[in-house]
Every structure is written in C-alpha cells, then in structure tokens.
Amino acid sequence: MVTIRLARGGAKKRPFYNIVVADSRNARDGRFIERVGFFNPLARGQEETLRLDLDRVEHWVATGAATSERVAKLIKDARKAVA
C-alpha cells in the first residue's frame, strides 16, 4: 500500500520532516517514491514551516495513496493557507 507520510531528518533534538510518498512496507526513513514537501516544526523568524506540492498530493490521493494522520492535518492546514 502506498502512503504519504513523514520521514524524519535533522539532528538530535532538532527534527525536520520530509513529506514523502512511499510503500508502507519500507522503513520510515527508507526508500520513497517521491518527495512532495517538507515540514519544519522548529522554524523561526522568516523560515518556512511547511511547503507542500498540493497538485502532486492530490494526484497520489486520487491514485489510492493513504495519508498518515499527521500528514492529513498538514494538508488541511496547507489548503487553508492557500485559500
């Protein structure tokens, strides 16, 4: 099953997440099909907190990809920010 989920990066105590489309059988930070954005929960000042390619997300959801709970919330927030 294909899922859209967070892959953790960054240093210890300084998380940074890539939003990726991956096969659910692969490891959290392992092989992925496509990177569709990023989420930086510790962004300060003018730094971007969230960047998401909504066209690609909609494409993957239309082809049957499931989203994790956190990614579904981030997609909702991104759509609200665009509108």
UniProtKB/Swiss-Prot annotation:
Disulfide bonds: none annotated. It comes from Shewanella frigidimarina (strain NCIMB 400). The gene is rpsP. Gene3D superfamilies: 3.30.1320.10. It comes from the Bacteria. The keyword Ribosomal protein applies. Belongs to the bacterial ribosomal protein bS16 family. SUPFAM superfamilies: Ribosomal protein S16 (SSF54565). GO terms for biological process: translation. InterPro entries: Ribosomal_bS16, Ribosomal_bS16_CS, Ribosomal_bS16_dom_sf. GO terms for molecular function: structural constituent of ribosome. This is Small ribosomal subunit protein bS16. One of its GO terms (cellular component) is small ribosomal subunit. Keywords: Ribonucleoprotein, Ribosomal protein.
